[in-house]
């Protein structure tokens, strides 16, 4: 089980096009299970993209904290779920209020969506 990030705009656009969107109160999650050949030929199982807009918070420190929280949420959900066996790509877009909400609440929401749709 290994996670890597989406590297460029082309990869983000491809996952947005192929993936299914799930709108939650504090974030939008795009999951693509049917990955193109360029993703399947790598050793990584999960491709993660995080988009944190300046509209969410103007301070880079806060935006980076949000990214760290998201990465940790994904690592927690991947380590104790059936995600280890399949290849998929995800894009997470946090919404307003993401930085104030309790971490365990975010973990519950994210794990419910991922486990329902995998």
UniProtKB/Swiss-Prot annotation:
Record has Hydrolase as a keyword: yes
Transmembrane segments: none
The keyword tRNA processing belongs to this UniProt entry's keyword annotation: yes
GO CC term, one of those recorded: ribonuclease P complex
Domain of life: Bacteria
Keywords in alphabetical order: Endonuclease, Hydrolase, Nuclease, RNA-binding, tRNA processing
Reaction equation(s) it catalyzes: Endonucleolytic cleavage of RNA, removing 5'-extranucleotides from tRNA precursor
Family affiliation: Belongs to the RnpA family.
Full protein name: Ribonuclease P protein component
Organism, as annotated: Rickettsia canadensis (strain McKiel)
Gene: rnpA
């Amino acid at each position: 089980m290994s996670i890597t990030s989406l590297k460029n705009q082309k990869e983000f656009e491809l996952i947005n096009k192929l993936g299914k969107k799930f709108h939650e109160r504090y974030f939008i999650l795009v999951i693509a299970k049917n990955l193109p050949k360029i993703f399947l030929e790598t050793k990584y199982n999960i491709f993660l993209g995080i988009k944190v807009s300046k509209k969410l918070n103007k301070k880079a420190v806060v935006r980076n904290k949000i990214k760290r929280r998201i990465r940790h949420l994904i690592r927690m959900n991947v380590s104790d779920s059936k995600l280890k066996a399949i290849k998929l790509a995800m894009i997470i877009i946090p919404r307003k209020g993401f930085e104030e909400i309790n971490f365990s609440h975010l973990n519950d929401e994210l794990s419910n969506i991922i486990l329902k749709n995998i």
